[in-house]
Amino acid sequence: MKLHELRPAAGSKSAPKRVGRGTGSGLGRNAGKGEKGQNARSGGGVRPGFEGGQMPLYRRLPKRGFTNPFTKHFVTINVDRLNIFDNGTEVTPELLLERRVVSKLMDGVKILGNGNIEKSLTIAGCKLSKQAAEKIVAAGGKVEVK
């Protein structure tokens, strides 16, 4: 078998329904749109959330809360991503960006504790979860809190 000979299993794929192509197809004449009316027209139908003139749900419910403009957004990574560094390396957000562990810095980097770390590293300038800090120290590394 070659790549160009691959085919889906028989019966696993069905052709799309072609509407408005004759009565013999079962979807001719009105093409599944019923008789006249708004929904039978081209571009017909109502917008999402429209309830026929009744006060819609999104307007019946009260407004609540606000978006805090001072929220800090951190890029998160797990400790197992730090195994790419050599023993004794000082890991900073700038180094993580340079080595493409993170794609952007936003308001900083937070290291979470998922996975295991085998290297002895010094972490500087990053926020850490409690588990991540414990794992880094247990591996012989140091944590300099931001």
Swiss-Prot record:
It comes from the Bacteria. Residues 1-54 are annotated as: Disordered. InterPro entries: Ribosomal_uL15 (IPR030878), Ribosomal_uL15/eL18 (IPR021131), Ribosomal_uL15/eL18_sf (IPR036227), Ribosomal_uL15_bac-type (IPR005749), Ribosomal_uL15_CS (IPR001196). One of its GO terms (biological process) is translation. The keyword Ribonucleoprotein applies. GO terms for molecular function: rRNA binding; structural constituent of ribosome. Residues 21-31, 42-52 have a biased composition (Gly residues). Keywords: Ribonucleoprotein, Ribosomal protein, RNA-binding, rRNA-binding. GO terms for cellular component: cytosolic large ribosomal subunit. SUPFAM superfamilies: Ribosomal proteins L15p and L18e (SSF52080). HAMAP family: Ribosomal_uL15. Part of the 50S ribosomal subunit. Binds to the 23S rRNA. Belongs to the universal ribosomal protein uL15 family. This is Large ribosomal subunit protein uL15. It comes from Clostridium perfringens (strain 13 / Type A). The lineage of its organism: Bacteria, Bacillati, Bacillota, Clostridia, Eubacteriales. The gene is rplO.
